[in-house]
Amino acid sequence: SIADALIEHKDEIIKANNIDIEYGKEIGLTPSLIDRLTLGEDRIKGMADGVRKVSSLPDPIGNVISGNTLPNGLTVTRVKVPLGVIGIIFEARPNVTADAASLCLKAGNAVILRGGKEAINSNKAIAKIMRDAVEKVGLPKDSIQLIEDTTRQSSTELMQLSDYLDVLIPRGGAGLIKAVVENSKVPVIETGVGNCHVYVDKYADID
């Protein structure tokens, strides 16, 4: 399985990740961004555990959401089906490669991943491991694809592939999400930017 393969090849992932970390330091990434970029054994185990959790979820495909019978006797139902090919654009968090791919595969979709340049070596290592793993269980290797070109042009071109992509999901900061929403010809599922904080007054009743 993908989870087992990630654990088995953790040394390869860490080696590739170290290259990204050094590059990140060279270009002046903040300590918090370096932390997001870093993959140690614990985080790789966390990725594998996440894949296993997704795998253990009920199969969503084929579930009947609703239905009714028309006056002429015809029964109409709404059934969950795969979206098709999902594109995901994300930034310097290589764990997204495993998270996104496993979620897409679970729902019967193929995925095209486009990560940031800061994590390209980590992303390539993880994507290769996952592609090899799915092929071993009889799935098409290309059900998981990674765009290795990290220039702005590659993300711009991805946003224009309305004939090939069924939906595009940006995952990252407000700037990335805004750029995808405003420029994509592919339908976009707009995500939140994260970093949402809740302040709880010391006199609040938590219960």
List where the protein language model places each region.
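N-terminal Rossmann-like NAD(P)+-binding subdomain of aldehyde/semialdehyde dehydrogenases
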Residues: S1-V76
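Conserved NAD(P)+-binding/catalytic subdomain of aldehyde/semialdehyde dehydrogenases
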Residues: V85, L146-D207
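Short alpha-helical
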Residues: E12, N95, N121, Q153, ...
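Conserved small-residue-rich beta-alpha loop and adjacent elements
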Residues: D49, K53-A133, V137, L165, ...
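Residue-level signal for inorganic ion chemistry
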Residues: S1, G108, L168
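Short acidic capping loops at alpha-helix termini that bridge into adjacent secondary structure
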Residues: P140-I144
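A structured beta-alpha segment of the ubiquitous adenosine-cofactor-binding alpha/beta core
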Residues: G40, K53, P71-R78, L146-S162
